[in-house]
């Protein structure tokens, strides 16, 4: 069950004219973007505004790297904001546009970098059940594509498709929940207890998500504050 969350009106209450402009722009440019330096070139990303779309961000909003990135680059902010407005106001069209983008790229024989791995939310989270269900439907539509995400919005989601890996950002140790993000000292102790790994990118290793691929199928990953 998704945690109760009410999006702000500035994202939900928009005019038909603004919505149609967003749809036209997303249809032209695409909803999925090729990964940044951390994700690498083999992973595509769809993001929403940080904090504004996150049902449970009290434990991480002060140190959220996505907030800095979001506030630093106006084009990124507009992209994430428009994504959120589209999803809140016309989820059906969001799904349709995303499917069209994937099919168009993957069915083009001249295109080299096919969409094979999708990171859901380098920024943002699953803000309600209907939105989560839409991603589940999309992942079932493309069984040959890997989808992965991190979330604080729920404790458990049963019967997820095998190609959709959603990692709970809270780690349970001795019946207590801890955020899987923090100082190197704290994260090292947690890693030993859960027998997981520390994201190599966050400890300075020269590797990206496209090469690592741990989070695509596994869930015991921890992150050093960076």
Predicted regions and their residues:
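Class I S-adenosyl-L-methionine
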Residues: 1-226
């Amino acid at each position: 069950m998704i945690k109760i969350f009410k999006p702000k009106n500035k994202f939900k209450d928009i005019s038909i004219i603004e919505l149609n402009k967003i749809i036209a722009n997303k249809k032209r440019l695409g909803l999925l973007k090729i990964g940044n330096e951390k994700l690498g070139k083999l992973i595509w990303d769809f993001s929403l505004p940080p904090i504004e779309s996150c049902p449970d961000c009290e434990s991480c909003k002060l140190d959220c790297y996505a907030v800095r990135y979001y506030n630093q680059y106006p084009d990124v902010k507009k992209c994430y904001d428009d994504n959120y407005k589209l999803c809140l106001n016309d989820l059906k069209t969001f799904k349709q546009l995303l499917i069209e983008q994937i099919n168009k790229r993957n069915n083009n024989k001249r295109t080299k970098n096919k969409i094979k791995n999708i990171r859901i939310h380098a920024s943002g989270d699953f803000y309600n059940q209907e939105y989560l269900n839409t991603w589940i439907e999309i992942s079932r539509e493309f069984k040959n594509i890997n989808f992965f995400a991190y979330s604080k919005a729920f404790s458990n989601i049963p019967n997820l498709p095998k190609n959709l890996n959603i990692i709970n950002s809270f780690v349970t140790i001795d019946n207590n929940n801890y955020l899987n993000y923090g100082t190197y000292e704290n994260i090292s102790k947690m890693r030993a207890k859960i027998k997981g790994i520390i994201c190599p990118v966050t400890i300075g290793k020269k590797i990206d998500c496209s090469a690592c691929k741990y989070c695509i199928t596994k869930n015991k990953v921890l992150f050093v504050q960076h």
